[in-house]
C-alpha cells in the first residue's frame, strides 16, 4: 500500500495528539506532520513515542497551501492522505480509500460539496456520498502524480477551505 498520511498542524496540540492516537489505533501507515511558525516549534514533541511518524517544523510561518505543496514535494509515496488534526479515525480508513484509487479515482475524501452557482461560485453546499465538485481536507486522499500534474495547491492560500476548493476544481479539470 504506497500511502502516507500527511497532517498540517497549526496549534491545537490536544487535537493533534488525539488525531494521531486514533490513526495509530487503526493503521500503521506512515504519518508526516508539517508545521511552521515559532509558536508551533514544540507542537509535535509529545508525539515522539509514535512509530513511523516524521515531523517537520519550519521557523517561518507558511500558509496551508504552501505547506501542502512542500509535503507533496517531500513525500515519496504514490498516494498522500491529507488530514486535518480535528479528524479522528474510528476504523480502518486507509484500505477502502486505496481501493477507490484502483477504480480510477484521482482523489477520494470523507466530505465534499457542490459549488454553489447561485452566488457566483463563492460557496459550496455539503453533499453526501457520490461525485462532488470539491473535496475537503478533513480527510482528502490524492494520487500524488495527479495532484502535481494539476499544479498542486495555491501557495498563497492561508486556509484549507479556500485551497481545497481551488485544488479540487483544478484536479477535476486536469483529469
Give a label for each model feature.
Residues 134-139, 148-173:
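Donor nucleotide-sugar recognition loop
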Residues 58-75:
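Glycine-rich, basic loop-to-helix element that forms the pyrophosphate-binding segment
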Residues 88-122:
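Conserved donor NDP-sugar-binding/catalytic core segment of glycosyltransferases
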Residues 123-145:
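A recurrent flexible, glycine/aromatic-enriched loop bordering the glycosyltransferase active site
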